[in-house]
Structures are given as structure tokens and as C-alpha cells.
């Protein structure tokens, strides 16, 4: 029997979706299908063709197509959802919830119809609530519907720590718990540089400032760009998760997982440390938390629940 390449579909061909597609192809993780709405079919095809034409120069073998027809996504191994509207001036987060929830429902129906055995990774904001929507709509088991926020939040944290210490980002590990918002909980106690606890290397006031900057990391970029939000680091974070699943790496990565009692929470999607491998979320790792960390997590959960109350 011929070996088949893996197939990854990316829903939403905006900056994040297109960047994700390009990185996936470059890493030769599989053939890539980039999907957007019919009104944007030509630009989507154009982006895909442009990427494909980079393949001889960069030396990667992956087919990339752009489409608005979900039939082209049939039998995907992984589907990444980046579709949705971004917040515009004058819009409340509530507006975002209602519109993006509708989009998630439509997208999920199509995804499930053509790829009933796929794994789904959701990036669309507010991501905790949108991942929950996709989970409900898909009827998939919890290990196959995953949200991305922690890899990105942790990457930001690691970047700021490496800058502070003037060292390689490769030597910094960190963990961010909770919702993807201003109440996220970077766990400094479980963060290291070259195996040395950060608390031994960075004074408390500087660490606190790094934590605060991490929480506001997305907003910092939104303000600098003036139009739109981050896409390079979010795309890179998605690719790391896709790779962990497709290669069954069993990586310990923060991901938005469905909790059934872990950390004392039930029936909610939340950012937690997980083992990510060939079966998607294979395990939620429960860390011992201090009272202060538990309180911070509870506040983060409350923020997520407030958004979830807006779901139809």
C-alpha cells in the first residue's frame, strides 16, 4: 500500500491562517488546504499558489491549495480553525462572541461532514469559549478538540525572560495557566532558565513586570500594528501543536483542554499543561498550586465563564 502524506486543512486565510499554512508546508508536515469564504476564493487561491511557488527555492515538498469548497478538505488528519472576525474599534468583546460563535458552528458542521476522524485545533478568539463551541457542535471526544493559547502565551513569556537575562530563548521554559486573557496565570514557580528557577535569576519586581507584559502581550501588538493582531507567533504556536500530534511526540505543552474535575473544574475548556501526542490531548497534567495561584486561576476561570454565558 502506498504511503500517504498527511493532510492539514487551515480554515480562514487571513494573516494567521496563511502564515500557518506556509509554515506547515515549509516543515513538510503534510499537504495543506487553505479555506476561506466564497467571496475570498480567488485571493485564497492566490496565496496558496504564491506559497507553492516558494517551494523550489526553500526546498520543501508539500502541495498547497486554496479553496472555498469544504469538499477539498475531505479526510484531513488535522483541521486548524483561524476563521472569525477580529475586534474593530467600537466593538465590544460580546459582539465578537456572537459573530464568531456563528462562524464556528458553520465551520464545524462542514469540517465534521468531510473529516469525521480529524483532530481540530481552534485559534479563533475568545478562544476558550470558541473551542467549547466547536466541541459541542462537533460531537467529537474531548481529546480531539483542542484550543491554542498557552503555547503562544508561554512563548511570549519566554521571549521576555530571555531578553531580560540576555540569553537564548531555547534555554527558557515556562508555563501559563488559565484563560487566554488579562487574567492568565504565568506560573513563575514552574519556570526555568537552563534548569535554574527564574526566581533565583531575576528580581521579583522585574519578574512581576514580565508577567504583566505577558498578560498584555496580545494587546501590545494590536496597539503597535494599529490594524489587526499578531499572526507570526500564533501561527508558529499552532504549527508546534500540529507537529506534536502528527508525529506523536507526546510533548508537554500548554493547551486549552476540556476539564472533567482537573484543578477542581468541570465542563469548561481552559488552558492547562497537557501531554500532546498522536491521540491529541492524551493527559491533563495537574500541578500543585499555592493558595495565591489557585485564587489567580479561579479569577481566570470566572472570566472564561463570563464569556461562556454569552454563548447562545
Curated annotation (Swiss-Prot):
Which Pfam family, just one, is annotated for this protein? Ldh_1_C
Q: Which domain of life is it from?
A: Bacteria
Q: Which GO terms describe its biological process?
A: lactate metabolic process; tricarboxylic acid cycle
Q: Which positions does the record annotate as the modified residue Phosphoserine?
A: 149
Residues binding NAD(+) are: 12-17, 36, 100, 123-125
Q: Which residues bind substrate?
A: 87, 93, 125, 156
Q: Reaction catalysed? A: (S)-malate + NAD(+) = oxaloacetate + NADH + H(+)
**Active site (record annotation):** 180 (proton acceptor)
Keyword annotations of the record? NAD, Oxidoreductase, Phosphoprotein, Tricarboxylic acid cycle
Q: Which Gene3D superfamilies match?
A: Lactate dehydrogenase/glycoside hydrolase, family 4, C-terminal (3.90.110.10), NAD(P)-binding Rossmann-like Domain (3.40.50.720)
- The record's disulfide annotation reads none
| Enzyme Commission identifier(s) | 1.1.1.37
Q: Which GO terms describe its molecular function?
A: L-lactate dehydrogenase activity; L-malate dehydrogenase (NAD+) activity
Under which main EC class is this enzyme filed? oxidoreductase
Under the heading HAMAP family, the entry gives: Malate_dehydrog_3
Reported function: Catalyzes the reversible oxidation of malate to oxaloacetate.
The family note in this entry says: Belongs to the LDH/MDH superfamily. MDH type 3 family.
Q: Tell me the protein's name.
A: Malate dehydrogenase
Specify the species: Geobacillus kaustophilus (strain HTA426)
Q: Which gene encodes it?
A: mdh
Amino acid at each position: 500500500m502506498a504511503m500517504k502524506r498527511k493532510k492539514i486543512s487551515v480554515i480562514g486565510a487571513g494573516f494567521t491562517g496563511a502564515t500557518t499554512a506556509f509554515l506547515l508546508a515549509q516543515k513538510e508536515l503534510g499537504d495543506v488546504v487553505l479555506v476561506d469564504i466564497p467571496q475570498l476564493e480567488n485571493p485564497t487561491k492566490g496565496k496558496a499558489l504564491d506559497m507553492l511557488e516558494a517551494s523550489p527555492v526553500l526546498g520543501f515538498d508539500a502541495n498547497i491549495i486554496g479553496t472555498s469548497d469544504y469538499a477539498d478538505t475531505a479526510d484531513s488528519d488535522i483541521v486548524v480553525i483561524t476563521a472569525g472576525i477580529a475586534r474593530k474599534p467600537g466593538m465590544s468583546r460580546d459582539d465578537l462572541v456572537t459573530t464568531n460563535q456563528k462562524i464556528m458552528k458553520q465551520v464545524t458542521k462542514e469540517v465534521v461532514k468531510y473529516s469525521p476522524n480529524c483532530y481540530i485545533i481552534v485559534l479563533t478568539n475568545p478562544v476558550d469559549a470558541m473551542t467549547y463551541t466547536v466541541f459541542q457542535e462537533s460531537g467529537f471526544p474531548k481529546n480531539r478538540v483542542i484550543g491554542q493559547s498557552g503555547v503562544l502565551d508561554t512563548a511570549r513569556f519566554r521571549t521576555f525572560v530571555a531578553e531580560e537575562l540576555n540569553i537564548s530563548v531555547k534555554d527558557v521554559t515556562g508555563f501559563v495557566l488559565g484563560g487566554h486573557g488579562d487574567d492568565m496565570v504565568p506560573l513563575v514557580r514552574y519556570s526555568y532558565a537552563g534548569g535554574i528557577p527564574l526566581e533565583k535569576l531575576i528580581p521579583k519586581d522585574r519578574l512581576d513586570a514580565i508577567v504583566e507584559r505577558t498578560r498584555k502581550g496580545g494587546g501590545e501588538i494590536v496597539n503597535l500594528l494599529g490594524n489587526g493582531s499578531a499572526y507570526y507567533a500564533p501561527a508558529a504556536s499552532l504549527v508546534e501543536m500540529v507537529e506534536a500530534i502528527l508525529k506523536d511526540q507526546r510533548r508537554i505543552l500548554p493547551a486549552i483542554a476540556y476539564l472533567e474535575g482537573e484543578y477542581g473544574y468541570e465542563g469548561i475548556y481552559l488552558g492547562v499543561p497537557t501531554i500532546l501526542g498522536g491521540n491529541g490531548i492524551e493527559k491533563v497534567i495537574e500541578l500543585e498550586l499555592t493558595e495565591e495561584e489557585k485564587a489567580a486561576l479561579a479569577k481566570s476561570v470566572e472570566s472564561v465563564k463570563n464569556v461562556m454565558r454569552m454563548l447562545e
